[in-house]
């Protein structure tokens, strides 16, 4: 399922140079523009959220019982979490966990819905993920990603992952990735329209003049940085300007470090209910 805010109405005569002027904030259409296939086992922490037979959002395993995603993704009472997925056509190494109700979902209490700040959510799974399982070729099938510790910067070179539509508009069978340049709130604010619903709890990916904005990944999916201590989840895909395949504006993410206390407290409070 795809999520959209109110998009700009574009006619065929509008030139690419004018698209940024009419672009509107919206949720990503789940696209990896100018990306390439990820290596198997490169991102064992990413999960696919599926309702019925359809992928609707991404997420990241942060503990054996917990997945971190965008708040706007948690709209269904029941859905499946598919971990260990690399190729859509091969589910031989996947682990599937069922979410049976809202009692397994936590959306940030200050998230107001739609495009805006505090777009973050947690999912609890009753059956823990097996984080020690290996695929048939010996790669890690499922693993958790590190949350930022503050030791390393959240900005700089990063990577984005997702199964979204590619340049041609087709959904790839293989997990895709894209190298991105991560910028902080102030720099992102200067690159966006003055009325953009940006908040200090956001970070962005941006390459000036490049058309690789909000299409770059599934809502709720991970933006990571590779550090000497492992892969850190620095951002969660939140929103970007639409039409995403044409705008040169930044993509906007929930900045994970801004919610480290909320994540910790939410998990601890939930544990007391079990």
UniProtKB/Swiss-Prot annotation:
Extent of the signal sequence: 1-16
Record's keyword terms, sorted: Disulfide bond, Hydrolase, Protease, Secreted, Serine protease, Signal
Record's GO cellular component terms: extracellular region
PROSITE patterns registered for this protein in UniProt: TRYPSIN_DOM, TRYPSIN_HIS, TRYPSIN_SER
Keyword Disulfide bond on entry: yes
Peptidase S1 domain residues: 32-268
Enzyme Commission number, as recorded: 3.4.21.-
UniProt superkingdom: Eukaryota
Induction remarks: By blood meal.
Protease found in the keyword field: yes
PANTHER family: PEPTIDASE S1 DOMAIN-CONTAINING PROTEIN, POLYSERASE-RELATED
Family per similarity comment: Belongs to the peptidase S1 family.
Summary of the function given for this chain in its UniProt record: Protein with lectin and protease activity involved in the establishment of trypanosome infections in tsetse flies. Binds D-glucosamine and agglutinates bloodstream-form trypanosomes and rabbit red blood cells. Capable of inducing transformation of bloodstream-form trypanosomes into procyclic (midgut) forms in vitro.
The protein's name: Lectizyme
UniProt organism field: Glossina austeni
Gene transcribed to yield this protein: Gpl
């Amino acid at each position: 399922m795809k999520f959209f805010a109110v998009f700009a109405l574009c006619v065929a005569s509008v030139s690419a140079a004018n698209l940024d002027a009419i672009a509107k904030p919206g949720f990503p259409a789940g696209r990896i523009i100018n990306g390439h296939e990820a290596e198997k086992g490169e991102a064992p922490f990413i999960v696919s959220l599926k309702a019925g037979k359809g992928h609707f959002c991404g997420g990241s395993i942060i503990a054996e019982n917990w997945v971190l995603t965008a708040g706007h993704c948690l709209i269904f009472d029941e859905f499946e979490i598919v971990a260990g997925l690399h190729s859509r056509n091969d589910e031989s190494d996947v682990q599937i966990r069922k979410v049976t109700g809202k009692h397994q979902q936590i959306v940030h209490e200050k998230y107001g819905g739609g495009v805006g700040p505090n777009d973050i959510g947690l999912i609890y799974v009753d059956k823990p993920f097996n984080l020690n399982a290996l695929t048939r070729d010996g790669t890690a099938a499922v693993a958790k990603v590190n949350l930022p510790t503050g030791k390393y910067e959240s900005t700089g070179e990063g990577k984005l992952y997702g199964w979204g539509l590619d340049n041609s508009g087709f959904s790839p069978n293989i997990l895709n990735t894209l190298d991105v340049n991560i910028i902080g709130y102030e720099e992102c604010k200067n690159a966006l329209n003055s009325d953009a619903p940006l908040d200090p709890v956001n970070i962005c990916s941006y390459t000036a003049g490049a058309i690789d904005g909000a299409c770059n990944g599934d809502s709720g999916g991970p933006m990571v940085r590779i550090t000497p201590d492992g892969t850190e989840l620095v951002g969660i895909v939140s929103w970007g300007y639409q039409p995403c395949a044409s705008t040169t504006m930044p993509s906007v993410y929930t900045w994970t470090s801004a919610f480290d206390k909320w994540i910790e407290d939410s998990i601890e409070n939930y544990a007391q209910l079990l």
